[in-house]
A protein has these predicted regions:
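Short, basic/aromatic beta-hairpin or loop at an interaction surface
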Residues: 17-20, 198-213
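A conserved glycine-rich beta-strand in the N-terminal activation segment of trypsin-fold
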Residues: 23-40, 219
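Short, well-ordered loop/turn sites that connect or cap secondary structure elements
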Residues: 37-38, 226-230
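Catalytic-histidine neighborhood of serine endopeptidases
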Residues: 44-88
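Short, surface-exposed secondary-structure boundary micro-motifs
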Residues: 48-49, 237-239
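Short, Lys/Arg- and Gly-enriched loop/turn segments at beta-strand edges
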Residues: 53-56, 240-250
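Long, charge-dense accessory insertions within large macromolecular proteins
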Residues: 90, 110-196
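Conserved small/polar residues in nucleotide/adenosyl-binding loops
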Residues: 258-260
């Protein structure tokens, strides 16, 4: 990345024990990326990522899908039950620990090394053994990489009081999905805005009128300076799916058998 033009220290992109860009990039809902763009928990995401929430709040009297929605003050921001925003606090290399557990535990089918249910149990053990604080808002996710040759545990914090702040009408925000995606060049206002709320101590909490906007560790600043040809760019986020960590045998299987 240095050769391509990265100028900031790599620790400002990701730091396991410090504040970095990763603290401003969130997992929005069940499968989208969001970006924290204010010190008080304002989150920018796609219109199609917020679509379910916009639909949830829409009615005959308030057709936000058609007309759009903008909260003019904090009191007008709409609580959205069921919607969550998740931060990654730490990513830990737990390969040695998992390898030891695999040797100790029974595995009659030989599938433990990739089993989500088994790895979830191992994650709980690791957190207990390493005295990692686990609260009701903590989510532990242990993932196998490179066909089970490496294991990483993601320690996450989940916020559940998320309120809708703004969204353009669908005529502006809807990006067309696969119907339009490969058909013609187009520009759409594919965005929506939400805010993370927490209790007065900044901890995740269920919706309450007493909750306050989250004072975040890090937020992104939107530049209006524009871009120049050759500027360094990179993307951080949560893709719906990818296969970048496939081993060669998996690539061969997809090419010759699955055809994906």
């Amino acid at each position: 990345m240095r050769e391509l033009g990265l100028e900031i220290p790599i620790e400002e992109v990701y730091s396991p024990n410090g504040i970095a860009l990763k603290d401003a990039v969130v997992h929005f809902g069940g499968g989208c990326t969001g970006e924290v763009i204010s010190a008080e928990g304002l989150v920018l995401t796609n219109h199609h990522c917020g679509y379910g929430a916009i639909q949830q709040h829409s009615s005959v009297e308030h057709d936000y899908l058609t007309e759009g929605f903008w909260a003019m003050n904090r009191d007008a921001e709409l609580p959205t039950p069921g919607l969550t925003v998740t931060f990654i606090d730490r990513i830990l290399d737990v390969t040695s620990y998992v390898t030891d557990q695999l040797k100790k535990d029974e595995d009659p089918n030989g599938t433990n090394y990739l089993s989500p249910s088994y790895l979830s149990k191992v994650a709980e053990r690791f957190a207990k053994d390493e005295n990692i604080e686990v609260t009701p808002a903590t989510k532990l996710e242990l993932k196998a990489f490179y066909g089970g040759n490496k294991y990483y545990m993601f320690v996450k914090t989940v916020y559940s009081d998320i309120r809708m702040v703004g969204a353009p009408p669908s005529s502006i925000g809807k990006f067309g999905a696969d119907t339009d995606n490969w058909m013609w060049p187009r520009h759409t206002g594919d965005f929506s805005l939400f805010r993370i709320y927490a209790d007065k101590n900044g901890k995740p909490a269920a919706y309450s009128r007493d909750n306050v906007p989250l004072q975040v560790k890090k937020h992104l600043k939107i530049s209006i300076a524009g871009v120049q040809e050759g500027d360094f760019t990179f993307v951080m986020g949560f893709p719906g799916r990818n296969w970048r960590y496939m081993i060669s045998d998996e690539v061969e299987e997809r090419l010759s058998l699955i055809h994906i």
